[in-house]
Amino acid sequence: MSLMIEGGRRLSGDLTVQGAKNSVLPILAACILSGDVCVLQRCPHLEDVDTSIDILRHLGCAVRWNGPDLEVDSSTLTRWDIPDRLMRRMRSSVVFLGAILARCGQAELSYPGGCAIGARPIDLHLSALRTLGACIREEGGRLDCTASGLAGAEIVLSIPSVGATENAMLAAIGAKGVTTVSCLLYTSPSPRDRTRSR
């Protein structure tokens, strides 16, 4: 594929940019933490957003569209579990784990699904949450998570993971103390530096 761009003409006009799916999904999970009304302007109306809305409603949140904007009221949150049928509809459903754990001190859910890329384990997510003090029991395809008190910690991911970082950040909001998230890949000294230190 190639593009040919002919310039020399002044550009003018207005363009309304819709929100991005990869940004809005963790923001929807973060709405849980506010305990109040959040408004997402120009929220994209996509299947994964609809699944997130279904999860929020299952948890007890009031969610409604107001034109292109989405309003989420999490003051009415009453549950901390996500059923398998909702978890399996999209890969990023696991990002709700950190937010629910921070808000409720417990969470019950199954492994996520919905990813056409193939199996991608969530061990980095679970490791990050355990580092913050969460107790996580994995049994029969379900995750039973409790946190009597999350504490700030230094989380070092073995490989880069946007989702695990998002989950750690959401859970860290409910933790006491400072949390830092880094990646071993970027924090390890280079081979040259290791040679110098010998």
Feature-to-residue mapping (PLM):
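Single conserved hydrophobic/aromatic residue that forms the stacking wall/gate
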Residues: Y186-R198
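Alpha-helix C-terminal capping segments
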Residues: A30-S34, H58, A99-R103, A172-A175
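Self-splicing inteins and homing endonuclease
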Residues: M1-T16, I53, G60-R85, A134-S158, ...
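N-terminal glycine-rich anion-binding loops that anchor highly charged ligand groups
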Residues: S2, T16-V37, R64-G67
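Internal alpha/beta core interface subdomains
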Residues: T165-E166, L170-T180
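Hydrophobic alpha-helical hairpins/lids featuring a short glycine-rich hinge
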Residues: W80-V156
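Glycine-rich, N-terminal phosphate-binding loop and its surrounding beta-alpha-beta segment
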Residues: Q41-P112
